[in-house]
Regions:
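N-terminal beta1-alpha1-beta2 submodule of the flavodoxin-like/Rossmannoid cofactor-binding fold
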Residues: 1-76, 83-85, 90, 94, ...
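Structural beta-sheet core signal
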Residues: 5, 76, 105-107, 131
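Conserved beta-strand segments of alpha/beta enzyme cores
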Residues: 28, 128-131
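Short, well-ordered alpha-helix to beta-strand connector turns
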Residues: 71-72, 100-101, 127
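Short glycine-rich anion-binding loops that position phosphate/pyrophosphate groups of nucleotides
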Residues: 79-82, 109
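Short, conserved loop/helix-junction motifs that constitute active-site signature segments
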Residues: 94-100, 123-125
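Glycine-rich, charge-decorated loop segments at or immediately adjacent to ligand/cofactor-binding or catalytic sites
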Residues: 111-123
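Glycine-rich phosphate/pyrophosphate-binding loop and the adjoining helix
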Residues: 130-158
Length: 158
C-alpha cells in the first residue's frame, strides 16, 4: 500500500509543506479544490471564511480521481481558518471515510492553531490519527524550524 498526501491550500503555504512531505516520503499527492474558488482580497476571503466556519458550511469540491482503498497512510494538510480546519478540508473529511487508515495531520497558520488538529481527528472516526504538526507562517515566510518539520516527516515511516 502507498501513502497519499492530501491537502487544501488557499495561499500556497499548505501546498508548500505538502510538496516538501511528498519529496521526502514519496507516494501520491492530491490537492483538494472547491468548485467555486475563493476570490477577492485577502480580507474578503477571511470574512467569507469566518462566515463559512461559523455556519458549518461545506463547499462543493471538485472531483478527484483517487481510490482511498489503495492507501493505508494519509498525510492530510489544511490551513487554519478561524481556529479550525478550512471548510474545504472539512467537506472532504465529511464525505470520505478514513476509518482503518493511519492519518498524519498538519496545519498551517499565521497565528494560532486553535482546535484544528483535534477537529481533524474528530472528523476521522475509526482512523489512527497520529500527533499532528503545527506549521507557523508569517505571511509566506516559514517560522516553524526546519528541524521540527523534518523530525515530524521522519516519524511518518518509522
Amino acid at each position: 500500500m502507498k501513502s497519499l498526501i492530501l491537502y487544501y491550500s488557499y495561499r500556497g503555504n499548505t501546498q508548500r509543506i505538502a510538496e516538501r512531505i511528498h519529496a521526502a516520503i514519496g507516494g501520491d499527492i492530491v490537492r483538494i479544490d472547491t468548485v467555486v474558488p475563493y476570490t477577492g482580497s485577502y480580507d474578503d476571503v477571511v470574512a467569507q471564511g469566518e462566515r463559512e466556519v461559523k455556519q458549518g458550511f461545506l463547499p462543493e469540491l471538485k472531483a478527484m480521481d483517487i481510490d482511498l482503498s489503495r492507501y493505508d497512510t494519509i498525510v492530510l494538510g489544511t490551513p487554519v481558518w478561524w481556529y479550525t480546519c478550512a471548510p474545504a478540508t472539512r467537506a472532504f473529511l465529511t464525505a470520505h471515510d478514513l476509518g482503518g487508515k493511519t492519518v498524519y495531520p498538519f496545519a498551517t497558520n499565521g497565528g494560532w492553531l486553535g482546535r484544528t488538529l483535534k477537529d481533524v481527528a474528530a472528523l476521522c472516526p475509526g482512523a489512527d490519527v497520529k500527533p499532528g504538526l503545527d506549521v507557523h507562517f508569517d505571511d509566506a515566510t516559514l517560522r516553524t524550524p526546519d528541524k521540527t518539520i523534518d523530525r515530524w516527516i521522519a516519524a511518518i515511516h518509522d
